[in-house]
Design a protein with these regions (language model features):
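Conserved catalytic motifs of ABC-family nucleotide-binding domains
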Residues: 172
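Helix-to-loop junction immediately C-terminal to a conserved catalytic motif
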Residues: 62
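Conserved ABC ATPase "signature" region
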Residues: 78, 128-146, 255-256
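Conserved ABC transporter NBD signature motif
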Residues: 70-78
Length: 261
């Protein structure tokens, strides 16, 4: 069995009563029967336009959203069968890197405080151990430990995203989900963050789901690609094959939108 396996996962949001109307809206099928797998140490790219269900699927994998149907397995264990208390215990196993690093970091926390909190979620440490572990995390993401007493507003966008990545690594997660982690950054910085994620995945044997609307970015970082449209996976395969010879018309449209030099 694969490291992570999704078996016919669906997420349906129920109809909502309008404030000014007696009519209910139709139920929203955000994720529709998705089945896919991720191998240990692999980067899976999940690509699709806004509103296709990528973020809902990622929240479901992280146990933040309960699926309406289907099952999710991590190393053979059915996550969807866990109780609420068991889910809370597993939170450190799943970490996320968000699109906007400034919004995802607490502005009143120094880097040290942010990383300390993330480290303590896995196990308690002495002051000296915490200081050393914070320094090590910062070095892993290409930041000088001398910056650990600074606040988010004192960093550039790329540096803030490095802090966010360090925070995700702190609890030693089993799975990292990066949701559009470079789309809010300058083009000149995007490749640096992508190369950092590739190096971390290789050096730490990280398993990662990388989410983006940009097929070229996903092709650059991913081992395999899953293309999502209207809640469904319409294409799934090796990254080079999907990028060079897409079989589905939607993937072909995404490829046609990639800028050519």
């Amino acid at each position: 069995m694969a490291f992570l396996e999704l078996d016919h996962v669906s997420v349906v949001f129920p109809a909502v009563q309008g404030l000014l109307s007696a009519r209910k809206s139709a139920p929203v099928v955000a994720v529709d029967g998705v089945s896919l797998s991720v191998e240990k140490g692999e980067i899976l790219g999940l690509v699709g336009e806004s509103g296709c269900g990528k973020s809902t699927l990622s929240r479901t994998v992280m146990l933040l959203q309960k699926p309406t149907e289907g099952r999710i397995f991590l190393e053979g264990e059915e996550l969807t069968a866990l109780s609420a208390s068991e889910v809370r215990k597993r939170r450190p196993d799943f970490q996320m890197v968000f699109q906007d690093p400034y919004a995802s970091l607490t502005p009143l926390f120094t880097v040290y405080a942010t990383l300390k909190e993330a480290l303590q979620s896995r196990r308690k440490r002495t002051f000296a151990q915490t200081r050393d572990d914070v320094a090590e995390l910062m070095e892993k993401v290409g930041l000088s430990p001398s910056l650990m007493r600074k606040y988010p507003h004192e960093f550039s966008g790329g540096q803030r995203q490095r802090v966010a990545i360090a925070r995700a690594l702190a609890p030693e997660p089993r799975l990292v989900i990066a949701d559009e982690p470079v789309s809010a950054l300058d083009v000149s910085i995007q490749s640096q963050i992508l190369n950092l994620l590739i190096a971390l995945a290789r050096d730490l044997s990280l398993t990662m789901i990388f989410i983006s609307h940009d097929l070229s970015v996903v092709h650059y970082i991913a081992d395999r690609i899953a293309v999502m449209r209207k809640g469904r996976i319409v294409e799934y395969g090796e990254a080079d094959k999907v990028f060079s010879s897409p079989s589905h018309e939607y993937t072909q449209a995404l490829l046609a939108a990639v800028p050519r030099l």
